[in-house]
Amino acid sequence: MIALIQRVSSASVTVEGNIIGEIDKGLLILLGVEQGDDEQKATRLCERVLGYRIFADDDGKMNLNVRQAGGNVLVVSQFTLVADTQRGMRPGFSRGADPSEADRLYQYFVEQCREQGVHTETGQFAADMKVALVNDGPVTFWLQT
């Protein structure tokens, strides 16, 4: 399971012209689910993402996690994160989880975020989404379990 996390001042996701998820300060989490991923990996990745210290403390050092910084999260499914890009000019997606399993684990990840007490907004699994963000920094990290 892969999470591309971006520290944002704001972010939103739109489907068919309607904003379905929106946050101010926090993390935009683009989530990719691979074959072999399970609830244990999703739980571990959620703990890492929510505990990752990428917000500035009073001394300006990256020393606070999203909870300590009073931030929110917006979780958006993105199967292209699991693409095989090693050869050729076209990505392959054979490493991606079956769509029904990917959706289940995506929803599980979202619930884990909520159970950790973080306000969590979402995109819509498998929809054509428009994601807007103001990247703060920019600060972007790739986490994988």
From Swiss-Prot:
Function, as annotated: An aminoacyl-tRNA editing enzyme that deacylates mischarged D-aminoacyl-tRNAs. Also deacylates mischarged glycyl-tRNA(Ala), protecting cells against glycine mischarging by AlaRS. Acts via tRNA-based rather than protein-based catalysis; rejects L-amino acids rather than detecting D-amino acids in the active site. By recycling D-aminoacyl-tRNA to D-amino acids and free tRNA molecules, this enzyme counteracts the toxicity associated with the formation of D-aminoacyl-tRNA entities in vivo and helps enforce protein L-homochirality.
GO biological process, one term: D-amino acid catabolic process
InterPro entries: Daa-tRNA_deacyls_DTD (IPR003732), DTD-like_sf (IPR023509)
Motif Gly-cisPro motif, important for rejection of L-amino acids in this chain: 137-138
Free-text comment on this protein's domains from its UniProt entry: A Gly-cisPro motif from one monomer fits into the active site of the other monomer to allow specific chiral rejection of L-amino acids.
Intracellular or extracellular location(s): Cytoplasm
Reactions this protein catalyses: glycyl-tRNA(Ala) + H2O = tRNA(Ala) + glycine + H(+); a D-aminoacyl-tRNA + H2O = a tRNA + a D-alpha-amino acid + H(+)
Protein name in UniProt: D-aminoacyl-tRNA deacylase
GO cellular component, one term: cytoplasm
Enzyme class (EC, first level): hydrolase
Keyword terms: Cytoplasm, Hydrolase, RNA-binding, tRNA-binding
Source organism superkingdom: Bacteria
Organism: Pectobacterium atrosepticum (strain SCRI 1043 / ATCC BAA-672)
Gene Ontology MF term list: D-tyrosyl-tRNA(Tyr) deacylase activity; Gly-tRNA(Ala) deacylase activity; Ser(Gly)-tRNA(Ala) hydrolase activity; tRNA binding
Signal peptide (UniProt feature, chain positions): none
EC number(s) per entry: 3.1.1.96
Subunit note: Homodimer.
Family: Belongs to the DTD family.
